[in-house]
């Protein structure tokens, strides 16, 4: 007789990872000046050991990731991205929008005139 094997669902694993990362980020945040600091947990307590191991594992990872993405947050790189986006997509938008609206209006009027019976609309050239 075989016992049923319970497998951890991927969602449960993902939730656990998110919880650990959120906890690590919360521990990384600085305490505002003037606020009383909580008493430090002894390193020998179970949660103190978990905290130290998680911090030991995640601190280099967070630092390395922060250093790798520093170029993105640099004002020059971000300004260059915005300038390129403007040049590629937004330059001349006003004139393009006016031309599109003018063409759409002419097309719509032409279609409406073609649908209108001659008796009601008459000929535009006759007065």
Curated annotation (Swiss-Prot):
Residues 1-27 form the signal peptide. The gene is APOC4. It holds the Pfam family APOC4. InterPro entries: APOC4 (IPR028120). Its main location: secreted. Keywords: Lipid transport, Secreted, Signal, Transport. The keyword Signal applies. It is found in: Secreted. It comes from the Eukaryota. This is Apolipoprotein C-IV. GO terms for biological process: lipid transport; positive regulation of triglyceride storage; triglyceride homeostasis. May participate in lipoprotein metabolism. GO terms for cellular component: high-density lipoprotein particle; very-low-density lipoprotein particle. Belongs to the apolipoprotein C4 family.
């Amino acid at each position: 007789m075989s016992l049923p094997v319970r497998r951890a669902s991927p969602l449960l694993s993902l939730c656990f990872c998110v919880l650990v990362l959120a906890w690590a980020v919360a521990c990384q945040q600085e305490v505002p000046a003037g606020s009383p600091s909580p008493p430090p947990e002894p390193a020998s307590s179970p949660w103190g050991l978990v905290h130290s191991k998680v911090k030991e594992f995640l601190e280099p990872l967070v630092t390395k990731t922060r250093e790798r993405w520093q170029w993105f947050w640099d004002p020059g790189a971000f300004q260059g991205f915005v300038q390129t986006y403007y040049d590629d997509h937004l330059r001349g938008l006003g004139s393009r929008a006016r031309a599109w609206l003018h063409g759409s209006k002419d097309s719509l009027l032409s279609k409406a005139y073609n649908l209108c019976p001659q008796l009601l609309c008459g000929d535009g050239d006759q007065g």
